């Protein structure tokens, strides 16, 4: 393989990654959310959503109501949580929410930060669920939880780049 083919392959790969990044950033701006697409990682929302479902979020100046399914993040925790709004209150121009997983026995108070009794709609919410695709996100769960699957996928990608003729 000559240098021109190597440069072409590198540029093609860079094009794929930059296109994916631009698509992600465009979705982020449109949905007004730093993470417009999330994968359900647990069974706390069954039967509404199963583990591995991909959720599409929207966060454009809307008030949540009881029954809405929201995704939120807590300070100090890296994994977003998908749960349903159980109660909502208004306090000094801000909306406060209490959430609970459909498959959980109790509300999410124990998941919130210390001394936090409600979620702040503006500060804690990533978005409201507007749509989903079932089970497609299971690949990301397999990659994060199974080391052999992760290295197998990396190996296949490496082999495919070595043996491609273009």
From Swiss-Prot:
Q: Which domain of life is it from?
A: Eukaryota
Per UniProt, subcellular location reads as: Endoplasmic reticulum membrane
> What interactions and quaternary structure are annotated?
Component of the signal peptidase complex (SPC) composed of a catalytic subunit SEC11 and three accessory subunits SPC1, SPC2 and SPC3. The complex induces a local thinning of the ER membrane which is used to measure the length of the signal peptide (SP) h-region of protein substrates. This ensures the selectivity of the complex towards h-regions shorter than 18-20 amino acids. SPC associates with the translocon complex.
**Membrane among the record's keywords?**
yes
Keyword Transmembrane tagged: yes
Alphabetically list the UniProt keywords: Endoplasmic reticulum, Hydrolase, Membrane, Protease, Signal-anchor, Transmembrane, Transmembrane helix
Show the GO MF annotations: serine-type endopeptidase activity
Q: Which gene encodes it?
A: SEC11
| GO biological process entries | signal peptide processing
Chief location of this protein within or outside the cell:
endoplasmic reticulum
First-tier enzyme category under EC: hydrolase
Q: How does it sit in the membrane?
A: Single-pass type II membrane protein
Cited SUPFAM superfamilies: LexA/Signal peptidase
**Catalytic residues as annotated in Swiss-Prot or TrEMBL:** 44 (charge relay system), 83 (charge relay system), 108 (charge relay system)
NCBIfam families attached here?
sigpep_I_arch (TIGR02228)
Q: What's this protein's family per the entry? A: Belongs to the peptidase S26B family.
Q: What does UniProt say about this protein's domains?
A: The C-terminal short (CTS) helix is essential for catalytic activity. It may be accommodated as a transmembrane helix in the thinned membrane environment of the complex, similarly to the signal peptide in the complex substrates.
Ranges of the Cytoplasmic topological domain: 1-9
- Region annotation (C-terminal short (CTS) helix) ranges: 152-163
| Name of the protein in question | Signal peptidase complex catalytic subunit SEC11
Q: Where are the transmembrane segments?
A: 10-30
Q: Which Pfam families match?
A: Peptidase_S24 (PF00717)
Source organism of this protein record: Candida dubliniensis (strain CD36 / ATCC MYA-646 / CBS 7987 / NCPF 3949 / NRRL Y-17841) (Yeast)
Which GO cellular component terms are attached?
Answer: signal peptidase complex
Q: What is its EC number?
A: 3.4.21.89
